[in-house]
Amino acid sequence: MDEMEELFGETADGLFAVDQNQRIVLWTAAAETLTGIKARDALGHPCHILEGRDEWGESICTKDCHIFQALRQGQPPPSDDLIVRRPDGRQVRMTFSVIPLQKGSAQAIIIFRENRLRGWQEIVDRAAAQLPAPPSTAALHVRLLGPLSLILQGCSLDSPPLTRPKVQKALKYLLAHYDRKVPKEVLMEFLWPEEDEEMGYRNLRVLVHTLKGALEPHRPPHQPSHFIGQEGGCYFFRMDAGVWIDVDAFQKHLREGEEAEKQGSPAQAIIHYEAAASLYRGEYLEEDLYEDWCAAERERLKELYISLLTKLSAFYAAAGHYEGAIDRLRQALAKDPCRESLHRNLMRYLWWAGQDTEALRQYEACRRSLAEELGIAPLPETTRLYQRIAQDLGDRRP
């Protein structure tokens, strides 16, 4: 063992060795640092003092566990990700690799490291520093997520013409369909469903003229609009004319985050997902919550928002940044208090962060939301997680 200590003692990865009876015979300084368990408390004890569990709280580190069964049978031992509770209450995700010392024997070296995204704090700081703002080159900044906001060259557009119900409704419809051309017949039916075609078209021409003037108060007479185009009987926003829309930017950041994930770059994915999350200031066209025409898009964007928050929470949890993971899940639950999978993940991350009591309270919050809103009870897997946390808390109480 002295030779092994000399060989492996300086490695940054945690390392310990066990004998035929699964008793720890070597425990390096890095193992102390990662687990919080001193060598004097580990040496001579069974290796299941680590109390490694899976993410559901089920014990994996047990006497004659599946790893040592494989060793004794001369089979390749599996590598596992385990959740290990440190003496300070914090739970950390570890990746373990097992090296047999002799075929058919339980003697082995176990190398482990904390499974976390390296440099997560730097990533979080970079994400915060790169939160998006409308580009200075954009003349018109439009926000549809949350209260409608239009900023023209630094000044808010809120002149009386834009507050007229029909003008504002037409403006919102064109902005909502910023990526396509809208036929005049569609606008006429949307704004004046009871009018005949002739009267509807007359009304539309007057309204569009008013809208152009409100968006460009200093446009010379008879000059074409810089922002609203007209072509082939269709109206549309000229996105190439310096128009920035938050929904467009939100979806671009989502796509770039997904692409970064595919390319194996979690740091870039986090930056883009955080950028997208910062753009979601509220419900899509929140002044029109009871309008059917934008309900489907509102729900779609909300689902995208919840999904990206869930991804961020998973990234942060993998990085050991449980505060960030917890915060993102709470933001997601604010949008959908009955999403049981969010409650479950939040319980798990609170538990891993050493906030066992808060994790149990989260189960009660989940149970109340489901009962009050849907008239149902939590799923068995949620209840099992609650019981596992409660048992763990009880086991550690004096």
Regions found by a protein language model. Give the residues of each.
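Short amphipathic alpha-helical recognition elements used for nucleic-acid or partner binding
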Residues: 158-191, 211, 251, 340-346
